Amino acid sequence: MMCEVMPTISEDGRRGSALGPDEAGGELERLMVTMLTERERLLETLREAQDGLATAQLRLRELGHEKDSLQRQLSIALPQEFAALTKELNLCREQLLEREEEIAELKAERNNTRLLLEHLECLVSRHERSLRMTVVKRQAQSPGGVSSEVEVLKALKSLFEHHKALDEKVRERLRMALERVAVLEEELELSNQEALNLRDQLSRRRSGLEEPGKDGDGQTLANGLGPVGESNRRTAELEEALERQRAEVCQLRERLAVLCRQMSQLEEELGTAHRELGKAEEANSKLQRDLKEALAQREDMEERITTLEKRYLSAQREATSLHDANDKLENELASKESLYRQSEEKSRQLAEWLDDAKQKLQQTLQKAETLPEIEAQLAQRVAALNKAEERHGNFEERLRQLEAQLEEKNQELQRARQREKMNDDHNKRLSETVDKLLSESNERLQLHLKERMGALEEKNSLSEEIANMKKLQDELLLNKEQLLAEMERMQMEIDQLRGRPPSSYSRSLPGSALELRYSQAPTLPSGAPLDPYGAGSGRAGKRGRWSGAKDESSKDWDRSAPAGSIPPPFPGELDGSDEEEAEGMFGAELLSPSGQADVQTLAIMLQEQLEAINKEIKLIQEEKETTEQRAEELESRVSSSGLDSLGRYRSSCSLPPSLTTSTLASPSPPSSGHSTPRLAPPSPAREGTDKTNHVSKEEAGVPRGEGPAVPGDTPPPTPRSARLERMAQALALQAGSPEDGAPPRGSESTPDSLHKAPKRKSIKSSIGRLFGKKEKGRMGPPGRESVSLAGTPSDETLATDPLGLAKLTGPGDKDRRNKRKHELLEEACRQGLPFAAWDGPTVVSWLELWVGMPAWYVAACRANVKSGAIMANLSDTEIQREIGISNPLHRLKLRLAIQEMVSLTSPSAPASSRTPTGNVWMTHEEMESLTAATKPETKEISWEQILAYGDMNHEWVGNDWLPSLGLPQYRSYFMESLVDARMLDHLNKKELRGQLKMVDSFHRVSLHYGIMCLKRLNYDRKDLERRREESQTQIRDVMVWSNERVMGWVSGLGLKEFATNLTESGVHGALLALDETFDYSDLALLLQIPTQNAQARQLLEKEFSNLISLGTDRRLDEDSAKSFSRSPSWRKMFREKDLRGVTPDSAEMLPPNFRSAAAGALGSPGLPLRKLQPEGQTSGSSRADGVSVRTYSC
């Protein structure tokens, strides 16, 4: 910047007036000259910007021409590559948009420059005087340079602010001066008034002194005495007062004179200010006139520029049109040249034939001896000419037929376009409603889009066929003209030969005409344009194509259609034979008279599919409403009914089919795969899942009330007496076990201990004492930090010693209390009491020792629950309100434990946890065979069989199982929610995302396959640990590999630097062994192996295939990488697996009444109730999957 600091501007207005008028005029002229030069320079910059804009536009047009030429070349070279042409068109559009943005930026810069000029001229016209002084001083300081636009703007801005302040100061001083003059005038008037008053008083006093003097003289004369001394004294006083008044009057007069002089000075200053103001106004008016003239000139220039731009644009348009016309003419010229060359070749051939004919004619004239032979030959040639004429007439009729068909195809093309427009409008209207649906509706709309692309391809093929027909027609017309010319020539030759006039043989041709006609035949295209008239394979192929698309659209709900049924979306994906078939398909079918019917069937099929979508939307809405109503009714029924009686179980199993199929729809997403106990009514957030459940019901293909029973939901009732005595024996062993351990450290038992309590030694559950490793004390591991809610102080201690005085008691008291609780449970099991008949202390002991609920929940149950019947009949809201369990996962844990105990202690429970089929629950046939083989006296059951793996509690899940899956980052959330192995199969997507913070979908997939691994092992923890130890050093049994074992395998391949990337990734053996879609590329992506490291990727691919083939039951598809297949999403994959047996296995873990009476509120995703199998059916047919699951307790 040349000047950052503004020069000092004198605030004295009289200094500027000291200059003479000539000097002021010269400075003004110099100022105007500089301003004009600045304006011209800015106009030059504007012109340069406009020139740059014009060059950019010219470049844009050149690029447009280049784009058009490239498009023409592409259309000529690759007319069938629609996908490539579409990509090129998109690129050209993007470039055009970029050029338009550049043009908009240039226009904005031009507008900014125009606004800058207007603002500059406005400032100059308003502040000419200040600008003149500033420019004069700046030129005096730096005479060598001219300031830039930025400096001029800064100077104008500062001058405007300075002179605005100066104007305000001058006005303020003038106002103060006028006020002071007014005050002084008032004071002068007051002083004059006082002087007049003093004069009056003085005159009155003088007259008063004279009168008393006369009176005194008379009295003196009369009396001989007078007050002469007193009068003299008063006169002296009055004279002194008069002198003082005179002095004051003199002072006032002096002040008045001073004020008058000041007033005159102010008037002079005011006059000079008025004169300066008049001069400034004149200069301002002059500058305004100049500005108006400049604006008028600029408007004229702009008008001229706009007219020039319009002329330029019109010239450019004309040039483009001329270029297009030139291109067309060049194309036509090329085609004409090719036709001309062909005609020249034909003329040469005709000349050769004519020479041959002349030679033959000469030979015949020389050799002709008799005229009858020549006449016979002529008669033969006339007959051949007649035949040629007949064939020519047939050919003309064929041409007329082709023209009629061409017109029909044009009309059909118009109708197809109208139908396409109608379909577009209908699809637009439909898209407003289909946007509210879930992913299935979106996929169907994508299918419709593919069908529309097929229709566009057909339209393009139709236009190509029309062009081919036009070319064929032109060639036929040309051949016709050539034939007529040849006929005339041959007739003239015949007339010359016979010596007759040309009119006598107008319908005759020589024998070479037939050769000419057949020699021209090969010039016609011998390919596909004429063949499809008699071919039916094209139509059959097209029917197969559309039928395949229709089948795919009908199978789009379950995604079970093979990948081969999906038609390729673009012609570029077809191979050679497919392209020929597609060409025959579109050309023959659309050019044949029956092609219109196929177009109509396509439109009808689209309309039917759209109507089906609308009907399905209505059905889904009705289903949602009925589901909500029935869920509310069922919730009221569940809250008022018990779950302990066999009759109620059978009545609930005999619900009407409509209720069993509709009211038990799950409010959880399909990714959960099974029911999640929830008693809340369906919320609007889960409407989409209701729709998917409705679709899955339709996929199952089972009518309401007639379908086969789904196994694994509701087990049959069996006796309970045999296993209860064995339960009592197991409890007795547990009560006498020496491994009870020391009691836990006492601490305050509040819900905040979920987050704030330090690690404590937990009370070992009864099952852990029974079936844990005998050589280890089963207290909480000291080195493992966990939220041990089950290990808080007992509820009795809290109830009897709320101040924490129980800490002073020894471990013997705690052992005695635990022994007393075990004795209560042992007594209940020995008596064979169902869970509903348990008393309050037994239920509390069960909650504390077996379920592992926190102490404050146990205390709340002690206060509110007095028997097992109350506990069994508690609804979800009552559990939350009465016991105070606000966490829904804690409520889920309690409900699952209650239902498990109700099923284990009910009279209809199975006599053994292992049945002939290997499952926990049994069919009627198994139950009858078992009751027939079992004596009524056996009333004991081994708790080693039922709860043999009951130590899979929330501590095992958080400390052992989740790290083995590679998901240790979710440990704290699982521990806080008390998630044990019983709850794993009942967690839905909402709970995983919300409370367990498992937002990553891949981590949810990993968790799902970990649960599937546990289910395949029957939740056998010892078996899992044994198999992991056996496969620690060998490549076998990959399904049980932990995340650490997978990392070790990767390190053993020589990829140790990438193995650490699998930490907290969710990669484990069950994912590798059970997920059919997981391949080496996914593993390389998780290992973060760069794509440039081809050697490492090849090694990983080889070893991964060896691992899958040796250690799993999977078989890698060799063509999977080559063939394009569209696999369903993992949600739908889970749903299909649920239908194949995952959900029945998860349902087998629940007791009968849990599915029947509470299923309306708890929900099961897309599965009806399992009905009781009638006698006579085999148990194997009622099983959807052979995987058996053991019941466990945590």
UniProtKB/Swiss-Prot annotation:
| Subcellular localization, as worded in the UniProt entry | Cytoplasm; Cytoplasmic vesicle, Secretory vesicle, Acrosome
Domain SAM, first and last residues per copy: 838-904, 953-1017, 1041-1110
Residues bearing Phosphoserine are: S17, S142, S207, S431, S508, S640, S645, S668, S683, S737, S794, S1123, S1164
- Which residue stretches, if any, does this entry annotate as coiled coil? 26-133, 171-501, 596-644, 1014-1040
What segments bear the compositional bias annotation Low complexity? 651-666, 1157-1169
Phosphothreonine found at: T714, T792
> What function is annotated for this protein?
May regulate the disassembly of focal adhesions. May localize receptor-like tyrosine phosphatases type 2A at specific sites on the plasma membrane, possibly regulating their interaction with the extracellular environment and their association with substrates.
Query: Quaternary form?
Result: Forms homodimers and heterodimers with liprins-alpha and liprins-beta. Interacts with the second PTPase domain of PTPRD, PTPRF and PTPRS. Binds RIMS1, RIMS2, RIMS3 and RIMS4.
Tell what the record comments on domains: The N-terminal coiled coil regions mediate homodimerization preferentially and heterodimerization type alpha/alpha. The C-terminal, non-coiled coil regions mediate heterodimerization type alpha/beta and interaction with PTPRD, PTPRF and PTPRS.
Name recorded for this polypeptide: Liprin-alpha-3
Tell me the organism: Mus musculus (Mouse)
Organism lineage:
Eukaryota, Metazoa, Chordata, Craniata, Vertebrata
